[in-house]
Regions:
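Non-globular, low-confidence helical/coil segments that flank catalytic cores
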Residues: 1-300
Length: 300
């Protein structure tokens, strides 16, 4: 009996030590961690800030993001500070429903443009049921999280107003909310510029070249960007030479899976190679992590 109790005691101590070390290693390390999750043909990004706060940008086309969050969030953490949806298309939006159901979310960021898809309706229902605070953001607004500054480059107030007007017209007619094709939603995709010391990252959603023309050359871009989340999964309409020459990204991450669209395109790859970008793809490498201390950075 004594040996049995001793075994339980030792086992309990070992378990306690494992939990303690897991807790210690999950504490904020003062670095920025950006995880581009492998969710197939879609986008889902988890950002853990130097002070321990966190943000999710898009949720991918399914629940795969939950597995990604489980790997990179502390095991005891069921709270996410900010969730942002770049635009309401399934390959960016659907997984956010599972995120909102599983985690307590403080703020939900979006543009004031939607659609009539069942997925978007379900997402709004969960946001309402969970009483998540919603913030509608447009170009020029900033979010400060510790030493990190996130600036919104797109959409502008005028673009959102245009989308709202189209929404009114088409919702009355029983058609799709935003014009005649869901591709129009890409025109309203949130574009975030993140700065942490000397480290810069650009998150582009599905914004294509005719959107990029509205912010290429902005005064926010005063030096080479370290990380580019490549627009629209590497679509041939996602970037042009002016965009790539403006950014000259050190690292370009393409979030992509098996698809029938030819993503990533040869044109996109060639543009990135022309400026010497390191190209990483989730379909070939799985989750991709970029870590920065505000001065240096590395790919994990």
């Amino acid at each position: 009996m004594f040996k049995l109790r001793t075994g339980y005691f030792i086992s309990g101590i070992a378990t306690g030590l494992i939990l303690l070390f897991s807790f210690i290693f999950s504490l904020p390390d003062g670095k920025l961690h950006i995880h581009v999750c492998d969710v197939g043909q879609g986008d889902a990004i988890y950002v853990r800030f130097p002070n321990g706060k966190d943000m999710v940008i898009d949720g991918g086309p399914n629940d795969a993001i939950i597995g990604c969050l489980g790997k990179y969030m502390p095991f005891w953490d069921r709270h996410i500070d900010v969730v942002a949806m770049t635009h309401p298309q399934k390959d960016h939006m659907q997984g956010l429903i599972a995120v909102l159901k599983r985690y307590k979310v403080a703020y939900f960021l979006r543009s004031d443009v939607g659609n009539s898809s069942q997925g978007f309706i379900d997402l709004l229902d969960v946001i309402r049921d969970k009483r998540v605070a919603v913030r509608y953001i447009t170009r020029g607004e900033q979010i400060r999280i510790g030493k990190v500054v996130i600036s919104l480059l797109w959409p502008s107030d005028q673009q959102v107003s245009k989308g709202a007007n189209v929404q009114d017209v088409y919702s009355k007619g029983g058609s799709q909310v935003l014009g005649q094709t869901t591709g129009d939603l890409n025109d309203y995709s949130l574009v975030f510029w993140l700065r942490f010391g000397a480290f810069d990252a650009l998150f582009t959603g599905d914004a294509d070249t005719h959107v990029e023309d509205n912010y290429v050359g902005t005064t926010l871009a005063d030096r080479t960007v370290e990380l580019l989340k490549v627009p629209h999964h590497g679509s041939r309409t996602g970037m042009n030479n002016a965009f790539v020459q403006w950014l000259r990204p050190r690292v370009a991450v393409i979030s992509v899976g098996k698809n029938m669209y030819g993503h990533p395109s040869r044109e996109a790859i060639n543009l990135l190679q022309s400026v010497g970008s390191q190209i990483h793809r989730t379909d070939k490498e799985g989750d991709i992590e970029v870590v920065s201390d505000g001065n240096t950075w590395k790919i994990e």
